């Protein structure tokens, strides 16, 4: 079971021609309850449950003119575990239970500056100052930097390069879920380098290419020996993606992309096949007055891990999923729609038990096969 209740309040105002202000408050309550009986006779039961509350308050101010855009602000966030959990022992040796929590203050500033007609420079700083309860590892404060330089070679060709630091707090489940949580886990941090190029063939067709490399100075992953989350060091991932976007005549549009990923990050699940080594995505849409129809999908190529290459951990390592959609809108307040997902009824999965334990092929979590959805939407 999964239940999420979210409340968001947001206020935006403009002050003159150059200043904007935005205030945001958000509260999200999330409850989950998962149970699995592996052998169908209650001998190998496994389950987890959680109940979290998240509060976020943000205040952002921005200034913009012809050459600059300056954004600065502060965010406050707090996560609280609503379930009493074992937290250790008091000074007298008695067991202690508590509702774990942590909070974070983030202060940031970013400047986008078009300092010459064909040059633009972006730079930013973000300082995080987290605090935890007394039973959780101390999270040290951290300052992240980012910058990017873009150059317009010609009116149709643009190149850019940059670097972005990251600092990611562990989730409440990573810290406190009894089955695999670890209250000693600390935030992940590192940086990503990126280089990109874009070319505009015409006002209707554009090509983009991006290469990236991410280095983890400290990451968070799952340790199969201890069956707990922990921190790892010196992970690296890199890849590229290319995309062609085109408007074909007045009624057709198309988009095709290819992404490639290599990752060597201890404790992640890329080597187990959760993320694709290569992935092709596409869509083609036809629009004519009141009628719209489209075909979209992806082709997935999984990385073969030499360590478990003989284990069939997934239904397929190469597969395509394709979807059709049709919309007819006789008037603005009335719409008929038909969606056919996974039109070839392909067996595929995004999660599996096979690679985590001694389960046999077939103990994966299949995604839906061919599904039909027909409906009518009317606005009053």
Segments and roles (model prediction):
Residues 1, 6-10, 38-49, 89-98, ...:
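Extracellular loop and loop/strand-boundary signature of outer-membrane beta-barrel proteins
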Residues 1-80, 194, 203-208:
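Outer-membrane beta-barrel domain signature, strongest for Gram-negative TonB-dependent receptors
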Residues 17-21, 67-70, 118-121, 156-159, ...:
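Repeated loop/turn-to-beta-strand initiation elements of outer-membrane beta-barrel proteins
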Residues 17-36, 152, 159-160, 168, ...:
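Membrane-embedded beta-barrel scaffold of Gram-negative outer-membrane proteins
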Residues 71-157, 169-170:
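Signature of Gram-negative outer-membrane beta-barrel scaffolds
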Residues 80-87, 131-137, 143, 151-194, ...:
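Surface-exposed extracellular loop regions of Gram-negative outer-membrane beta-barrel proteins
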Residues 114-122, 212-215, 231-308, 344, ...:
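Gram-negative outer-membrane beta-barrel transporters
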Residues 195, 273-380:
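Conserved C-terminal beta-signal and adjacent last beta-strands/turns
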């Amino acid at each position: 079971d999964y239940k999420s209740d979210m409340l968001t309040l947001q206020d935006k105002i403009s002050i003159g021609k150059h200043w904007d202000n935005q205030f945001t408050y958000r509260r999200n309550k999330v409850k989950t309850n998962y149970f699995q009986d592996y052998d169908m006779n209650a001998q190998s039961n496994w389950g987890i449950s959680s109940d979290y509350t998240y509060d976020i308050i943000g205040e952002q101010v921005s200034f913009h003119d012809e050459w600059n855009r300056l954004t600065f602000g502060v965010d406050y966030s707090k996560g609280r575990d609503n379930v009493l959990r074992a937290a250790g022992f008091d000074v007298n040796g008695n067991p202690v239970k508590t509702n774990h929590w942590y909070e974070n203050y983030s202060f940031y500033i970013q400047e986008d500056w078009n300092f010459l007609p064909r040059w633009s420079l972006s730079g930013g700083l973000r300082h995080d100052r987290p605090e935890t309860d007394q039973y959780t590892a101390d999270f040290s404060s951290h300052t992240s930097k980012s910058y990017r330089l873009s150059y317009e070679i010609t009116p149709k060709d643009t190149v850019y390069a940059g670097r972005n630091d990251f600092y990611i707090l562990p989730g409440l489940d990573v810290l406190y879920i009894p089955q695999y949580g670890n209250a000693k886990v600390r935030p992940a941090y590192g940086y990503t380098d990126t280089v990109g190029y874009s070319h505009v063939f015409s006002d209707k067709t554009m090509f983009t290419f991006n290469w990236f490399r991410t280095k983890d100075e400290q990451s968070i992953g799952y340790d199969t020996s201890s069956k707990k989350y922990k921190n790892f060091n010196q992970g690296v991932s890199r890849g590229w993606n290319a995309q062609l976007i085109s408007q074909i005549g007045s009624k057709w549009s198309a988009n095709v992309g290819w992404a490639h990923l290599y990752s060597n990050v201890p404790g992640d699940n890329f080597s187990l096949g959760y993320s694709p080594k290569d992935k092709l995505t596409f869509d083609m849409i036809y629009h004519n007055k009141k009628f719209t129809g489209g075909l979209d999908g992806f082709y997935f190529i999984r990385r073969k891990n030499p360590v478990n290459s003989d284990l069939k951990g997934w239904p397929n390592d190469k597969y395509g999923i394709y979807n059709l959609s049709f919309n007819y809108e006789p008037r603005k307040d009335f719409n008929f729609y038909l969606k056919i997902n996974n039109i070839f009824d392909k067996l595929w999965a995004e999660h599996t038990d096979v690679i985590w334990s001694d389960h046999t092929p077939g103990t994966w979590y299949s995604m839906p096969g061919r599904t039909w959805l027909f409906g009518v939407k009317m606005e009053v």
